[in-house]
Each structure stands twice: as C-alpha cells, then as structure tokens.
C-alpha cells in the first residue's frame, strides 16, 4: 500500500510539472497586434487666421463665440474677445458682416469695440438694394470729433423716414416714406444739398432711432456713397442717435 501511494504521488507531481511546461494553445488564424495607447487628452487646436466677425439678430459673434451684450459683463467680454485677436484688428480695415435684422445698438457696440481695439476702419457688409454698394467703410467716432460744424448728419426715424441736417443743428429735411422704407431718391437729394452747404467736410454721420433695424441704417450709409453731385468719403456711425435737427455732441 505504501508503494502504491508513492506511485500515485509521483504521477500527480509529474502531471503538474508537465502542465506547467505546456503552453496555452493559440488560434493560428488570429492576427497579433500591438496594444495601441490612446492619445493624451489635450485642448482642441485653436483656429488659425482672423476670426469671422458677425452681428445677427442674436447679437455679436467673434469666431464661434456669441457675446451676450445684455449681460452686465457683455461689453467687457466683447473687448476681451477682440483683444485676443489684436493681430488681426490693430491698424487693419476689419471686415464685419451684419444682418439686416441685427439691432443697431449691437452693430454700434461692435464697431466701437473694434475701434477701441485699434482698427483703422470697419468694413461692414450687409445685404442691400442692387444699386447700393455691398460694403461700407465706417471710420471711428474718435477720428471725426474735429469735423466741421456744417458736416452732414443723416438719421432713420421711427416712422421709416430719413432726416438730414447739419452737425451744428438746424432744420431737419425729412424724406417721405416709400413702399419698403424711406424714399432713398429724395434722401440722396437732401444729402447732396447738405454736402454743398459744407464744402470743408467730406464726413457724414449716420444713425437711427432705437427701434429701427440695422438694414435701413446700412441703406442710408450706402446711399451716401452713391451721390452723383457730391462726395462724402468718410462715414461715421453715431449710437445712440441724436435728435433730428438738434446740435450733435461727439462725446
């Protein structure tokens, strides 16, 4: 019995040793691949080149970021976003696309922020009438503070009529209302007459009442660039708007 027990013991030991030496069977058709480590998580790459600047009904947008100007820190965030793109703004004619249904105040804030960021001018593009230019270059208000007192001022009124008068104040000549807004032909006649009375200035200041959409303001600015008998080479946006006929303070 003792010999039999020893024999069984040696058989079990041998079996266990042979089991340790044997390798697991592999599938001959299985492809061996190295383990690939996932790439480290990093911040998404920032887009190269100047950001697209737009103003829509939702408000100003710098690149992919909407700026909520109605928030207490809205103006600060707009200035910060423009400051982060200073290389594309400072000393440049900066392109800006503004939708017709954008708020005048929002477009005004964007133009003002770009001017404070060092832009030489802001070239605004807006859909308009076929006879008007598709872009208008706006100079900063600061660059026009020394404009002669006789300089031309034009404004779109709440009742969708245009008013034209001089920077120093005086009678505002109002155009009749057309089918799709102010009568632009009559407006251009008033602009030419006002420009002839001020030969020392080629500046025109444009604005509108608060409830007027940007598209009509753009039409007015564009009309100043298509005069046949006068030339108004510098366009400046005033916002908020002055009262028609009153002296305009360029603060």
Language-model regions: role of each:
Residues 1-9:
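Bacterial N-terminal signal peptides that target proteins for export
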Residues 9-11, 201-202:
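Intrinsically disordered, low-complexity proline-rich regions
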Residues 15-19:
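C-terminal motif of bacterial Sec signal peptides marking the signal peptidase cleavage site
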Residues 21-251:
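Long, low-hydrophobicity, acidic/polar, solvent-exposed interaction domains
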